[in-house]
Amino acid sequence: MLMCRRWLVCSLRCHYRSFSFSAARRTVMPAWVIDKYGKNDVLRFTKNAALPIIHYPNEVVVKVHAAGLNPIDISMRGGYGAATMAMKRDPLNISQSGGEFPLILGRDVSGEIMECGLDVKYFKPGDQVWAAIPPWKQGSLAEFVVVSGNEVSHKPKSLRHDEAASIPYVAATAWSAIVNTGGLNKDNSAKKRVLILGGSGGVGTFAIQMVKAWGAHVTVTCSQNAERLVRDLGADDVVDYTAGPVEKQLKNLEKFDLILDSIGGETEKWALDLLKPWSGAKFVTLITPFLQNTDRLGLADGMMQSAVTVGCKVVKNLRKGVHYRWGFFAPSGSALDEVSEMVDAGKVRPVVEEVFSFAQVPEAFQKVEQGHARGKTVVSIMEDQKE
């Protein structure tokens, strides 16, 4: 009987704790939103954005302390991937066209858990966390955001929130491309040769540190003025793309086990020749036509066109003894758990180029849109809310 009563009391307390935030909170919050796709002038600040609520028992509400911006935010502002994102948000097409608006951008979040769904076991209100938010969900340029429990992870203890917000999206992207698609991990990377095309941006600066921490030899392409940065992060060889044709410079080096391409364009016409043939070597590109195809042709035809395109390239390169793959962002709290350990162990550090205030979100977008990044652009949100 005593055990039963303890279980009942515990259950009631857990139930109350999980939803205590809902009972007393407001129904609106400050946020930056867009009401249509376009250029920077579509960004609008509002104090009346709908405050997010838990819809599924595995979700958590996070109070945003800092948000990170990524090139995907610039693309999404202009409508890139709208067809695919709409399908992910509304698989049955119940909502009318434009049902995603007002849309909140921002893929990185670092903050504090305020509320947990009933199935969330590893987090509690008050936990300091970070997460990479999938593009089909409402983003982090707001006071609060809802994420799934399997997307969130405890923030590294050694980082401030504005530092932590620079890592999750690029870490999840690099992890998906290098580990899930490329096949490298901490146990098999020693002495492997890795080439990172475009090493000074967000994904590149993280990928350098991760594979270097795993014992790989890292070669990076970047401009001359980014060489010091990438060498400080662990790059062994640096190729300056402003000093002449990159492919000619790279052909003078030993061949590679893995190439991570964050540049796209003409690179895949010559980069696969830099791989070690018949050794399982892989070329993984993050620049794919998948979302462009679905936007242009519709979901079904776009997916078919993408399958044909990648299939032809896979077969063509298999004949040469190398593997061609597309890499994609994949949210993963478990991957961020491992990254958090690497950060606290001093093996990975944040690379923040500039921090903007919440009032400066349009300026932050302009900074990312200019390109030639030397790390990440971050928006500090919690400090503005205190004022």
Swiss-Prot record:
Which InterPro entries does its entry note? ADH-like_N, GroES-like_sf, NAD(P)-bd_dom_sf, PKS_ER, RTN4I1, YIM1/Zinc_Alcohol_DH_Fams
Localized where? Mitochondrion matrix; Mitochondrion outer membrane
* One Gene Ontology molecular-function label: oxidoreductase activity
- The highest taxon in the source lineage is Eukaryota
Kindly state one GO CC term assigned in the UniProt record: mitochondrial outer membrane
Do the record's keywords include Mitochondrion? yes
Biochemical pathway: Cofactor biosynthesis; ubiquinone biosynthesis
Swiss-Prot/TrEMBL keywords: Membrane, Mitochondrion, Mitochondrion outer membrane, NADP, Neurogenesis, Nucleotide-binding, Oxidoreductase, Transit peptide, Ubiquinone biosynthesis
**Domain Enoyl reductase (ER) intervals:** 38-379
Span of the transit peptide along the chain: 1-27
Output the CDD domains linked to this UniProt entry.
Answer: RTN4I1
Entry's Gene Ontology BP terms = eye photoreceptor cell development; regulation of dendrite development; retina layer formation
Chief subcellular location equals mitochondrion
Reaction(s) catalyzed by this protein?
Answer: a 3-demethylubiquinone + NADH + 2 H(+) = a 3-demethylubiquinol + NAD(+); a 3-demethylubiquinone + NADPH + 2 H(+) = a 3-demethylubiquinol + NADP(+); 3-demethylubiquinone-10 + NADH + 2 H(+) = 3-demethylubiquinol-10 + NAD(+); 3-demethylubiquinone-10 + NADPH + 2 H(+) = 3-demethylubiquinol-10 + NADP(+)
Look up the EC number in the record and give it. Answer: 1.6.5.-
Listed binding positions for NADPH are S200, G202, V203, S223, Y241, L286, G327, F329, H372, A373, R374
Role this protein plays: NAD(P)H oxidoreductase involved in the ubiquinone biosynthetic pathway. Required for the O-methyltransferase activity of COQ3. Able to catalyze the oxidoreduction of 3-demethylubiquinone into 3-demethylubiquinol in vitro. However, it is unclear if 3-demethylubiquinone constitutes a substrate in vivo. May also play a role in the regulation of retinal ganglion cell (RGC) neurite outgrowth, and hence in the development of the inner retina and optic nerve.
The protein's matches in PANTHER family, at most eight in alphabetical order, are given as: ALCOHOL DEHYDROGENASE RELATED (PTHR11695), RETICULON-4-INTERACTING PROTEIN 1, MITOCHONDRIAL (PTHR11695:SF294)
As for family, the record states: Belongs to the zinc-containing alcohol dehydrogenase family. Quinone oxidoreductase subfamily.
UniProt protein name: NAD(P)H oxidoreductase RTN4IP1, mitochondrial
Question: Which organism's genome codes for this protein?
Answer: Danio rerio (Zebrafish)
Q: What is the lineage of its organism?
A: Eukaryota, Metazoa, Chordata, Craniata, Vertebrata
Which gene is transcribed and translated to give this protein? rtn4ip1
